[in-house]
Amino acid sequence: MKITKITTYRLPPRWMFLKIETDEGVVGWGEPVIEGRARTVEAAVHELGDYLIGQDPSRINDLWQVMYRAGFYRGGPILMSAIAGIDQALWDIKGKVLNSPVWQLMGGLVRDKIKAYSWVGGDRPANVIDGIKILREIGFDTFKLNGCEELGLIDNSRAVDAAVNTVAQIREAFGNQIEFGLDFHGRVSAPMAKVLIKELEPYRPLFIEEPVLAEQAEYYPKLAAQTHIPLAAGERMFSRFDFKRVLEAGGISILQPDLSHAGGITECYKIAGMAEAYDVTLAPHCPLGPIALAACLHIDFVSYNAVLQEQSMGIHYNKGAELLDFVKNKEDFSMVGGFFKPLTKPGLGVEIDEAKVIEFSKNAPDWRNPLWRHEDNSVAEW
């Protein structure tokens, strides 16, 4: 079997799908994207495609090493996202050829279900509370929400109080009947993170995500030393080498590699194993589409330390398409009591509605994240 063609489809809301075709008619799907940089990743995919056409798709490990090591300059969000989507598609092909789900090819199940959590948006506490009530009705009891809006490098007590007030009202409304993580989104400087984390501790959030930017990872162990709240990070780390430094330094309790950013299934399985050796748990980052989610689920079901799975159903970014709009076998992604079951169809287990993908790709938006500014007109972290 040989790879004959690679096609990319930019799609709403901010996704990109990839299709790898073979000379025997077996097709694999992947999801390579950096949100807001889809065209750049698309160019990288097709550059890497020069290494792949005519090659045997079953040699996943070798092809991964070729894509990573054949270029003198390597790594980073663009190239690793391109590799990630290609890697997903190669695993999809292998599973289809062998008539087996990917998790079976990786040694079989380590659990029977994985807890999912849902993002809850809203600018005011009442909106967040209403959103949680709706999601609880369909089985969710674990959520993630913004921990704050933009904060100055050194900000005032009013800004801190506003962030804490939202969390306080949520905990008061639901008590210990729900769990929620708070996403700082890298918006908070190290000095302000110390202040905000201390103020949030009484409300017992499940975790605090990206308390500072990944570029400031040296602060993770320092922040962890002052709090009992687990710290989470990883969506802006792109290889096992990035994660190695964080694991060695300590401070992070929950790693959040993104299966569409950090080298795909092949690389993230290695990252999961590294994390387990440090007694660090895994909760793959996934505010993306169904192929990315499927890849995450296969890692969840073969990684002992996987504890939570993010998913984008109903997320505020999903304008123009919802999580399962391009999926034929929607029922396989059904959650029971807030848990996903293993996908059982061969490969990644996602049956893509290709005609719909082609149609929607004709008018795909070029999504960009907002540009925020502080009161003094300097650029703020989004």
Curated annotation (Swiss-Prot):
The catalytic activity of this protein is classed by the Enzyme Commission as 4.2.1.6
Reaction catalysis annotation? D-galactonate = 2-dehydro-3-deoxy-D-galactonate + H2O
Q: Which Pfam families match?
A: MR_MLE_C, MR_MLE_N
Any one GO MF annotation of this record: galactonate dehydratase activity
Active-site feature positions: 185, 285
At which positions is Mg(2+) bound?
A: 183, 209, 235
Keyword Lyase on this protein?
yes
Q: What pathway or pathways are given for this protein in its record?
A: Carbohydrate acid metabolism; D-galactonate degradation; D-glyceraldehyde 3-phosphate and pyruvate from D-galactonate: step 1/3
- Which keywords does the record carry? Lyase, Magnesium, Metal-binding
Q: Which domain of life is it from?
A: Bacteria
Return one Gene Ontology term, BP aspect.
Answer: D-galactonate catabolic process
Keyword Lyase on entry:
yes
Q: Enumerate the residues marked as the site Increases basicity of active site His.
A: 258
In chain numbering, where does the site feature Transition state stabilizer fall?
A: 310
Q: Which family does it belong to?
A: Belongs to the mandelate racemase/muconate lactonizing enzyme family. GalD subfamily.
Q: What else is known?
A: Reaction proceeds via an anti dehydration.
What is this protein's function?
Answer: Catalyzes the dehydration of D-galactonate to 2-keto-3-deoxy-D-galactonate.
The entry's protein name is D-galactonate dehydratase 1
Which species does this protein come from? Escherichia coli (strain SMS-3-5 / SECEC)
